Design a protein with these regions (language model features):
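Short, solvent-exposed loop/linker segments at the N-terminal edge
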Residues: 2-9, 103-109, 198-205, 321
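Conserved structural position at the C-terminal beta-strand
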Residues: 72, 169, 289-290
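Flexible, low-complexity linkers/stalks enriched in Thr/Pro that connect modular domains
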Residues: 83-94, 171, 181-190, 292, ...
Length: 321
């Protein structure tokens, strides 16, 4: 009528009595809660003074640690007591702690998942059967970290994108708890693609030369730019075009040269267009800076015909290069 170790199953207590004399009047079964110390009458079996064997049973469904004793009384009011060994019953699932501390916002700093688990009996500070394992699985269902009662994992470059990790805690009687967390990890800067060329003269190389004095650039944050197999990106957060003269940077506030995005979107894009022919800007160069919602940044320097004219101190007709 006992278990020698923890069990997840209900425990059946069988009480057998024998009286070959005046007969068994009744048997009382008491349960002692080893956690609280409370003794409770859980069985009152009236046998009316019959002789011979009697069999009674009680099923323990509430989890906990218990032992039982039975008191048998015959028709002459003689009593005898018998005790059981301890019963260890665990119905509670493990509790996973720490998932809520994982950064789930877009970031370019590798997030870490650090979790632990407990296996207390419900409503107590008494440990039940205890933890067998804590495991972390990636979105490909591959095991990436494991421990007996805790586990941690820091994302790698191959985890770039939006990824859901599953945490699984198992106790020693087979109860399993699961939790999940979705990380958003972006380490690929936005891309800037345009019509500029590389100009070479007298051994001097000038990259980003706008030969027609028109700034025409496409900016996006698509996942094809990632070399790590990202499944999603944070999207463009801002695009700003500057005129740079010496150490002075001046923002060009036009609909085609300045934009701030409200929320992350993998497929966000912006097309920069600026006709220097219409402005006759006297600047050293132009600078495009774009950032995504994870904090990655891309810069691009562009030069115009006027820049080359100043650099080489010669006459350059528009469209000559």
């Amino acid at each position: 009528a006992s278990t020698y170790s923890w069990t997840a199953d209900n425990v059946n207590i069988t009480v057998r009595g024998y009286d070959g004399g005046v007969g068994n009047r009744y048997i009382l079964l008491y349960r002692v809660n080893c956690i609280t110390g409370v003794t409770t009458l859980v069985g009152n079996y009236q046998h009316g003074g019959i002789s011979g064997w009697t069999t009674d049973s009680y099923t323990q469904t509430d989890e906990g640690i218990y032992y039982y004793y039975a008191v048998s009384t015959d028709n002459d009011w003689h009593s005898i007591q018998g005790n059981t060994r301890r019963v260890y019953l665990d119905h509670s699932d493990p509790v996973i702690i720490g998932v809520e501390n994982t950064n789930t916002e877009w970031t370019n700093v590798a997030p870490s998942i650090a979790v632990r688990s407990t296996d207390y009996l419900m409503g107590t500070v008494t440990v039940g059967s205890g933890l067998r394992s804590v495991k972390i699985y990636n979105d490909k269902e591959n095991l990436v970290a494991a421990g007996s009662n805790q586990a941690s994992y820091t994302l790698r470059e191959t985890d770039e994108g939006e990824r859901t990790f599953v945490i699984e805690a198992t106790d020693n009687v087979g109860h399993i708890s699961r939790s999940s967390v979705t990380t958003r990890y972006d380490i690929t800067p936005p891309g800037i693609d345009g019509t500029e060329i590389t100009f070479v003269r007298d051994g001097i190389v000038v990259s980003g030369y706008m030969q027609d004095n028109i700034m025409d650039q496409h900016i996006d944050d698509e996942i094809v730019r990632s070399v790590h197999g990202a499944n999603k990106s944070s999207g463009i957060k801002s695009v700003i075009v500057y005129k740079v003269t010496g150490t002075k940077e001046e923002v060009i506030y036009l609909d085609t040269t300045y934009h701030q995005f409200v929320s992350p979107d993998t497929h966000s894009f912006f097309d920069v267009y600026y006709d220097i022919n219409q402005t006759e800007d006297a600047v050293d160069y132009y600078l495009i800076i774009t950032r995504d919602f994870a904090g990655n940044q891309t810069k691009k320097k562009l030069t115009s015909q006027r820049t080359l004219l100043t650099m080489f101190r010669t006459s350059i007709d528009r469209g000559a290069y």
